[in-house]
């Protein structure tokens, strides 16, 4: 359940200046989202902070349930381990996909019962398994014979899901090697689970984080169907299929600054058809689970940051570059900035002259920057240190990946709006 990322260093690029009346230097956000409340909160903020719109998250949850009725949601906690967000999702009926005993404990504090929490991490020590079992969790993901043996010893009688590997094709983060096993190994794993006194409960997949194609879901379904058919011959009848995460956010840009436009309607159609296909294959009725993370929270979180400096420097190759340094970056809110771009808004500069700049965070790490290949951002030339910058669609992983004081920069505080009246939190 830990995402693989690749760091990128920032090569030199030419920049040009031109006049524009655009409010920002990038394409507008999808019209599907009502950003009225979150924009008002950004405007009201007088210091840097992350803002979560609980009402927006609730609308997103309702839309997901409407597209996939009957599917049990297990929110991927790693995407947004903020107590108020978790409490709100629990009240809506969500359970939780936890990756550690610490996440399990946090999930339990929302008031959900342990049967709405599964230990979705295939990587866990004997101690982790025993702790989760003591906390009441009985559903464990697995992908190896060694892990099955450990679960049998430290969580006797537990239910196991075997994670079947996918290629990760079409996703920004593929998750294809560290997690999951081949369909052939899945048969061995579930055979071993049964022999060890565990309940072979289900199969799971993950098509990759920020999946951009519907075909990935279709391929995953075919792989699951093949395993189910083989299990029928072995006399193993499963109860549940966990379709994992991967549903995308809509408000971010690719690393070149182009809007990402995943075919969400087609994805849902393929998933619905896939569930029917798997029901016809399995020897008994199937329940389905889903582990959305960024899909629920990314587009309903934003950061109020400020400008550290807009500077112009000549590089060793003779090119001149403009750099916009922000008060937050990869290590305190924008961890994924090397693989995608967040939409920036400059509320104090609705027009005027713009320059194309590399956007970077405040730390002394050169990875703390947008990957600038053909993806320079239009920035108001007149913007000054201290002026606000609004960063949209960064509600996923903003708090989870933040460091604790790298270079002395502390995690951002957060505010939750909507829900039962909103609340202010401490550092993320």
Please annotate each region the language model reported.
Residues 76-82, 99-102, 122-124, 143-147, ...:
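Active-site beta-loop-alpha junctions enriched in small/polar residues
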Residues 72-74, 95, 116-118, 139, ...:
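Structural preference for beta-strand elements that scaffold enzyme active sites
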Residues 60-66, 83-87, 212-214, 298-300, ...:
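Short, solvent-exposed polar/charged micro-motifs at secondary-structure junctions
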Residues 1-153, 157-158, 195, 199, ...:
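A charged N-terminal "starter" segment
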Residues 86, 109, 129-133, 151-154, ...:
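Short acidic, glycine/serine/threonine-rich loops at helix termini
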Residues 270, 276, 280-428:
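Charged (often Lys/Glu-rich) extended helix/loop segments that serve as interaction or gating elements
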Residues 2-3, 168-311, 407-409:
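Active-site loop/helix belt of alpha/beta enzymes
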Residues 52-55, 59, 80, 84, ...:
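Conserved active-site and cofactor/substrate-binding residues in soluble primary-metabolism enzymes
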């Amino acid at each position: 359940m830990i995402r693989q990322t690749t760091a990128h260093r920032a090569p030199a690029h030419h920049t040009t200046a031109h006049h524009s009346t655009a409010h920002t230097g990038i394409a507008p956000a999808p019209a599907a989202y009502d950003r009225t409340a979150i924009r008002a909160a950004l405007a009201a903020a007088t210091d840097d902070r992350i803002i979560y719109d609980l009402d927006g998250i609730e609308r997103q949850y309702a839309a997901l349930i409407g597209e996939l009725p009957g599917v049990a949601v297990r929110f991927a906690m790693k995407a947004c381990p903020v107590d108020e967000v978790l409490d709100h999702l629990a009240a809506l009926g969500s359970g939780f996909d936890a990756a550690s005993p610490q996440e399990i404990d946090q999930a339990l504090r929302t008031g959900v019962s342990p049967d709405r929490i599964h230990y979705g991490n295939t990587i866990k020590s004997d101690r982790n398994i025993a702790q989760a079992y003591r906390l009441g969790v009985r559903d464990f993901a697995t992908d190896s014979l060694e892990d099955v043996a450990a679960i049998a010893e430290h969580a006797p009688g537990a239910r196991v899901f075997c994670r079947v590997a996918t290629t990760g094709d079409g996703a920004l983060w593929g998750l294809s090697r560290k997690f999951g096993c081949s369909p052939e190994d899945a048969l061995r794993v579930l055979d071993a689970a049964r022999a060890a006194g565990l309940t072979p409960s289900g199969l799971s997949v993950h098509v990759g984080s920020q999946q951009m194609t519907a075909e990935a879901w279709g391929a995953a379904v075919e792989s699951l169907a093949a395993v189910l058919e083989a299990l029928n011959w072995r006399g193993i009848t499963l109860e549940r299929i966990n379709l994992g995460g991967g549903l995308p956010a809509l408000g971010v840009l690719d690393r070149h600054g182009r809007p990402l436009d995943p075919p969400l309607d087609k994805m849902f159609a393929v998933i619905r058809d896939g569930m029917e296909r798997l029901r016809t294959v399995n020897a008994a009725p199937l329940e389905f689970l889903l582990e959305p993370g960024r899909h629920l929270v990314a587009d309903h979180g934003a950061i109020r940051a400020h400008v550290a400096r807009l500077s112009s420097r000549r590089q060793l190759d003779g090119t001149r570059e403009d750099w916009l340094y922000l008060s937050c970056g990869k290590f305190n809110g924008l961890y994924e900035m090397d693989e995608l771009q967040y939409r920036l808004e400059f509320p104090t500069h609705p027009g005027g002259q713009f320059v194309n700049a590399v956007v970077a965070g405040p730390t002394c790490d050169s990875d703390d920057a947008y990957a600038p290949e053909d993806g320079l951002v239009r920035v108001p030339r007149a913007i000054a240190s201290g002026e606000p910058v609004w960063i949209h669609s960064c509600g996923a992983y903003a708090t989870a990946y933040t460091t604790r004081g790298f270079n002395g920069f502390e995690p951002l505080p957060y505010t939750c709006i909507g829900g039962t009246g909103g609340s202010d939190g401490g550092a993320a």
